[in-house]
């Protein structure tokens, strides 16, 4: 049974990491949409700061610029809505991995044993640790760093460490140097558990 649990855990972690490219793509597209927003907003301020004399042709210029700005905002809104939907789908997958035993059962892959990293793990402890990480999947850098700092300080939960490292593939808010330090401790087997 323990070997089976280790295989499930290994398979699940591989699945988490496989989502990284999708997450990066969504973030990139969202950033592109935000750039459209920023450019449209800059254009709006530029237009509003101009003092046009009230001649027909200059009013037409102002209206044309406003129309262009509004079109940019509408396009950015649409793109952001699409990206938000993509992100929510990823988050649902993320939480599904944490909470549905059936998903683990369907993800079993015959991976070799990962040594000390998996020896103390059970399905229950893995799911509990991953669920805790899923609940902290928030857009708050300080909150993420606080979690990392706490785990680095206590060094008492290797399974939670493994899960957090996997979760980072979906959450780019954690500082990379903190992640590297934490992963190093796990690989050196310097965490308890």
Residue ranges of each PLM-predicted region?
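Short, low-to-moderate order helix/coil transition modules at the start of elongated helical scaffolds
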Residues: 1-66, 156-176, 180-193
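Extended, amphipathic alpha-helical coiled-coil scaffold segments used for oligomerization/tethering
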Residues: 2-10, 31-135
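Charged, alpha-helical coiled-coil and adjacent rod-like segments in eukaryotic scaffold subunits
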Residues: 96-193
């Amino acid at each position: 049974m323990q070997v089976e649990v280790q295989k499930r855990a290994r398979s699940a972690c591989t699945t988490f990491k496989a989502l990284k490219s999708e997450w990066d793509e969504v973030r990139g597209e969202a950033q592109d949409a935000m750039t459209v927003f920023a450019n449209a907003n800059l254009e709006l301020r530029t237009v509003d700061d101009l003092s046009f004399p009230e001649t027909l042709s200059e009013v037409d210029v102002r209206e044309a610029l406003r129309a262009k700005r509004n079109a940019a905002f509408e396009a950015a809104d649409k793109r952001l809505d699409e990206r938000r939907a993509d992100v929510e789908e990823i988050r649902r997958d993320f939480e599904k991995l944490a909470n549905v035993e059936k998903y683990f059962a369907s993800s079993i892959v015959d991976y070799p044993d990962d040594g000390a990293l998996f020896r103390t793990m059970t399905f229950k402890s893995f799911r509990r640790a991953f669920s805790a990480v899923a609940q902290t999947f928030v857009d708050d850098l300080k909150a993420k760093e606080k979690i990392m700092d706490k785990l680095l300080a206590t060094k008492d939960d290797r399974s939670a460490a493994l899960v957090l490292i996997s979760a980072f593939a979906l959450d780019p808010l954690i500082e990379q140097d903190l992640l590297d330090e934490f992963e190093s401790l796990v690989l050196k087997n310097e965490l308890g558990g």
